[in-house]
Amino acid sequence: FKMNRNSMSEMYQQMLFVTDSRRQDMSFILDSLIEIQQLIPELKSKLDQEKIVAAGHSMGAATAMLVSGMTLVNPMDGYKETSDEKRFDALLMISDPTNMALMPPEPWKGVKVPTFISTGTNDFSDVGSGRMSAPFTYQIPENLLQSSSPHHFVLIEGADHYMGGLICRTDVPGPFQYEELQIASNMSVTFLDAYVKNNPKALRSLRYGNLSVKTKGKASHSLR
C-alpha cells in the first residue's frame, strides 16, 4: 500500500500495521533458522542462535525496538502495540524514529537489552505531507546515572536520515556522507564486538574511549 501522509489518523494506523507485520516476520525468521540453513547450505554452522541482534533504520529501528521491549502507542486512539519476543540479546539502530508521535515519552524505559543508537544533527522524520525537523529524542535524561541496561548514543555532526543518500534512499539531496557513515559503521561494529562477541577490548573502547577526540569533534558518544 501507499502511505497516506495527508491523514494523520490513517498514517499512524498504517505505520502500526507495518511494524506489527515486520515484528511477526522477525519472529518467524527466528523460528525458521534451522530450515533457512537447510535451504542455504552456505549458512550451515554460521548462524549463532545464542547471539541474536535486532537492528534497523528509521521505521526499521521502531520495529527493532518493538521486539526488544518497547511499546508503540497510537496517539489518535491510545492503541498500544507490543511484542512478547524475548530472544533478542542486543538492539542496534541507525536513525531511530526520533519524535514520531507513536513513540512513548521515554522509549528507553522499555528496552532491557544493550542498545546502540546512532543519529545526526541533521536527522529528520517525514511527518504528514511535508518534512519536519526532528530532534534526537530517544536519548535518556542527563540526570539518569544508569539505565537497566547499557545504552550507547552516538551523535554525528551533520549526519542526516539517509547519510546523503548512501543508505535506504538514493533520491535525496547529497552530497554523500561517507565520513558520517564510516563513524556510524565503526561504532556499530565496536558495539557488536563488545556485547555479542564479548570482546573486552571493544568494551573498554566503548566505556573509556573518546569519540569526540578521535573524530576531531565530528561525533560524540555517551553511555547510560
Residue map of PLM features:
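Extracytoplasmic/periplasmic, Sec-exported soluble proteins
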Residues: 14-22, 83, 176-184
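Extracytoplasmic/secreted envelope proteins and their assembly/folding machinery
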Residues: 23, 27-30, 65, 185, ...
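Primarily recognizes the serine-hydrolase "nucleophile elbow" in alpha/beta-hydrolase
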Residues: 29-110
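Structural recognition of the beta-strand scaffold that forms the well-ordered cores
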Residues: 51-55, 90-94, 115-119, 152-155, ...
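Alpha/beta-hydrolase active-site loop
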Residues: 2-49
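Active-site-adjacent alpha-helix of alpha/beta-hydrolase-fold enzymes
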Residues: 109-185
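Alpha/beta-hydrolase-fold serine-hydrolase catalytic core, especially in secreted/extracellular enzymes
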Residues: 156-162, 166-224
